[in-house]
Amino acid sequence: MTYIDFYFNVENKLNKIHEILEKEIFRKRKIFIAVNDLNGAEALSNFLYTASITSFLPHMIGHHEEKAPIHIGWDYKSVSDDFMINLKSDISPSFSRYLRLIEIVSNNEEDKKTARDRLKFYRDRGYEIQLIDASKEI
């Protein structure tokens, strides 16, 4: 069964993604990040290249069979079933194939509303969900 984490009250989604990726890469995870479109993928890729001068997060845009542990895409096609970070407002039709799904929710009211809809969808289907208040993390 897919384990789902909802990070809410996130001030900066990009920083939270970077934080999560650094932990999960260390654990040898294969990660798919779902974004809205190519522009979103390129913006995230650029951020990952410049976010830290002390670490590098190997990634690529698209779903090629390359060995990069992080793939960024917008069509929900992934080369791995290990781990997904959903940055889209809709629900992936294939979310249940992943061992773990992370939803990141900002303080934006529209983002909160669509996140509540996704949360209800997952709960109604019996998924175990962990709610993590990012404003209380150290």
For the regions a protein language model found, what residue spans apply to each?
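A generic structural motif
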Residues: 55-66, 129-137
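Glycine-rich phosphate-binding "P-loop"
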Residues: 1-13
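Short hydrophobic beta-strand segments
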Residues: 5-8, 30-35, 84-85, 103-104
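Trafficking entry modules
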Residues: 100, 105-111, 115
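Helix-rich interaction surfaces within compact, conserved domain-sized segments
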Residues: 84, 93, 111-119
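Mid-chain, well-packed structural core segment of small domains
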Residues: 63-102
